[in-house]
């Protein structure tokens, strides 16, 4: 219904196309309850993952972007990621241990939907960490469930966004702080 419409006056059609996927990333950061004391790893730097990078950075978190594409990692850096890891060419675990002093990230946001990245999220998150899964795995994911218990993890899913997430993205785009040319 019309009551659900959020005006995006002044934005180009290209900008408007970014609102929904970025809002999903914004919402995942809210679900993870990210604060400025957190180190957040975002796996996958597509539009949804980049939305998570932006929102986590805006909340003051240290953001580690992980992807297989150096161009996407460079864009993530422009949007607030403090570190980037190319999982195709680097040892993700070793680099995370280096960046986090051996503890792993406090929060992992999985935005790919691959069984490999689901397992990576659980394996790499810190003790008492938080994992938010956005991506849909098309195949079964096999976990060592002892890690859930031993690491005392909080794991949740996130699939959409709230009106506040949409408004946040629209305001960000109106300020011109997001490079929509990429």
Language model: regions and residue ranges:
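Glycine-rich phosphate/adenylate-binding loop and adjacent beta-alpha elements
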Residues: 1-6
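Mid-domain Rossmann-like dinucleotide-binding core that forms the NAD(H)/NADP(H) cofactor-binding site
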Residues: 11-90
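Glycine-centered, small-residue-biased loops immediately flanking beta-strands
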Residues: 38, 129-130
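Local beta-strand N-terminus motif with an aromatic residue
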Residues: 81, 104-105, 180
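C-terminal substrate-binding/catalytic core of Rossmann-like NAD(P)-dependent dehydrogenases/reductases
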Residues: 93-98, 138-182
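A glycine-rich helix->loop->beta "capping" turn
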Residues: 99-107
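N-terminal Rossmann-like NAD(P) cofactor-binding module of classical short-chain dehydrogenase/reductase
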Residues: 109, 132
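Helix-to-beta-strand junctions that scaffold the AdoMet/dcAdoMet cofactor pocket
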Residues: 125-127
């Amino acid at each position: 219904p019309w009551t659900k419409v959020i005006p995006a006056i002044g934005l180009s059609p290209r900008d408007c196309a970014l609102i929904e996927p970025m809002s999903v990333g914004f919402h995942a950061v809210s679900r993870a309850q990210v604060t400025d004391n957190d180190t957040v790893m975002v796996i996958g730097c597509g539009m949804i993952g980049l939305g998570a990078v932006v929102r986590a950075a805006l909340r003051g978190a240290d953001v580690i972007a992980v992807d297989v594409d150096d161009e996407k990692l460079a864009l993530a850096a422009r949007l607030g990621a403090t570190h980037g890891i190319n999982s195709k060419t680097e040892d993700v675990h070793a680099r995370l241990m280096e960046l986090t002093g051996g503890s792993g990230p406090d929060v992992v946001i999985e935005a790919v939907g691959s069984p490999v990245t689901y397992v990576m999220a659980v394996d790499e998150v810190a003790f008492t960490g938080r994992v938010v899964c956005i991506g849909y795995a098309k195949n079964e994911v096999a976990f060592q469930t002892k890690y859930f218990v031993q690491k005392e993890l909080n794991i949740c899913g996130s699939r959409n966004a709230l009106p506040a997430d949409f408004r946040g993205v629209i305001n960000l785009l109106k300020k011109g702080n997001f490079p929509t040319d990429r």
